[in-house]
Amino acid sequence: MLNTENYEFWFVTGSQSLYGEETLRSVEKDAKEIVEKLNASHQLPYPIVFKLVATTADNITKVMKEANYNDHVAGVITWMHTFSPAKNWIRGTKLLQKPLLHLATQFLNKIPYDTIDFDYMNLNQSAHGDREYAFINARLRKNNKIISGYWGDEDVQKAMAKWMDVAVAYNESFKIKVVTFADKMRNVAVTDGDKVEAQIKFGWTVDYWGVGDLVAEVNAVSEADIDAKYADLQKEYDFVEGQNTPEKFEHNVKYQIREYFGLKKFMDDRGYTAFTTNFEDLVGLEQLPGLAAQLLMAEGYGFAGEGDWKTAALDRLLKIMAHNEKTVFMEDYTLDLRQGHEAILGSHMLEVDPSIASDKPRVEVHPLDIGDKDDPARLVFTGMQGDAVDVTMADYGDEFKLMSYDVRGNKPEADTPHLPVAKQLWTPKQGLREGAVGWLTVGGGHHTVLSFAVDSEQLQDLSHLFDLTYVNIK
């Protein structure tokens, strides 16, 4: 997968000097134990670093500034061991530009009825401190996440892990650079949008480059690199020549490998992590990138067809959140409207990420009527079963909106011998009819990101961080 920062999260424990040094030492000891055991749980995707017991406005402000300035810090986790006067948190919290998690927990998960006294109550008053602290976050309109429960429980740790993935995706969003080779497909509305506003709101840089600049990189790829990659792919996938001569099959597959290396070098040299192509502008290329795009998506690059830079950036963003697992560019195509069989068949002309393949992908070469170029090689496979979210983004003039619904992924009821593309079947969980009406009413697009590794709660959390309107169609 494309590399991201080696992120960590800082743990800040709230208290106050009123309780004395002995109590504060106990607070620090307990906080360090929580951090140590959370890191040892193997439930969290990123490490937590204990920073301090925060007792004054000055030390709170200082640590929040430090979190901002350290690029490897993805967010701050706060816990109120005791009561912590919330006015102390105002300045630092206002300055904090990283995601914030309020962990509403307690060091012990029970009340020691036989031994409890007021010293114990003073030390273990998270329920008291949580309410004071949560008020100031709400008063500041902080858009922070709150997770409540015992820190040692697996469900709480899994909730923290999901939030960590959201926080990292948020940080990485401001590094996403999309290259569009040619403009978007002519006369299409939903794939258009305000690139300046996208950079202001999400941090996305979107640059146009002419196809000729890509062609130069493609033509410069060495035969040795192509031959080596061809041999590697023969080990990983089934090669099916079909109606092609052996010479034509090998040539067309190797040309996609040439495009793969050309695209990869072009992006890596310039810092791009997502890209779009357009079948209307392929001057100088023999084929529309198919297998090439699929191989790059499998490595974590974002992609969308027809110049759809929003979906390409969203694809990259959700791949980061999902650790590049089971998260793919997708398009709604054909419906099964029979009662009891309701489903959407999703695919694209060529470019569906093999991370959702339920069978061994096959490398095949077939004609493509669109684009007026040579027959492109592509990976052909059937998608998977399971719970997923289907996500899209559109620009409505006055705002961007993120939209999704929960779906159930299924396999087709029968083979499709005349459909030589990757395909995925799914049904909205609220029903095909209800889901379609909800999607169409809000104006959801035909290009989406389908993920079996991200859920709607994470999309809601991400939208809060961006102050982005999120429509969860139910």
Curated annotation (Swiss-Prot):
GO cellular component, one term: cytosol
Alphabetical GO biological process terms: L-arabinose catabolic process to xylulose 5-phosphate
Name the UniProt record assigns to this protein: L-arabinose isomerase
Disulfide bonds: none
Cofactor note (record): Binds 1 Mn(2+) ion per subunit.
EC number(s) stated in the UniProt entry for this protein: 5.3.1.4
Phylogenetic classification of the source organism: Bacteria, Bacillati, Bacillota, Bacilli, Lactobacillales
InterPro entries, per the entry: Ara_Isoase_C (IPR024664), AraA_central (IPR055390), AraA_N (IPR055389), AraA_N_sf (IPR038583), Fuc/Ara_isomerase_C (IPR004216), Fucose_isomerase_N/cen_sf (IPR009015), Lara_isomerase (IPR003762)
Pathway(s) this gene product operates in, as recorded in its UniProt entry: Carbohydrate degradation; L-arabinose degradation via L-ribulose; D-xylulose 5-phosphate from L-arabinose (bacterial route): step 1/3
Residues involved in Mn(2+) binding: 306, 331, 348, 447
Function per UniProt: Catalyzes the conversion of L-arabinose to L-ribulose.
Taxonomic superkingdom: Bacteria
Pfam families assigned: AraA_central, AraA_N, Arabinose_Iso_C
Family of the protein in this entry: Belongs to the arabinose isomerase family.
Keywords: Arabinose catabolism, Carbohydrate metabolism, Isomerase, Manganese, Metal-binding
Reactions the enzyme catalyzes: beta-L-arabinopyranose = L-ribulose
Cofactor requirement: Mn(2+)
Class in the EC hierarchy, top level: isomerase
Gene: araA
Source organism: Latilactobacillus sakei subsp. sakei (strain 23K)
Any one Gene Ontology molecular-function term assigned to this protein's record: manganese ion binding
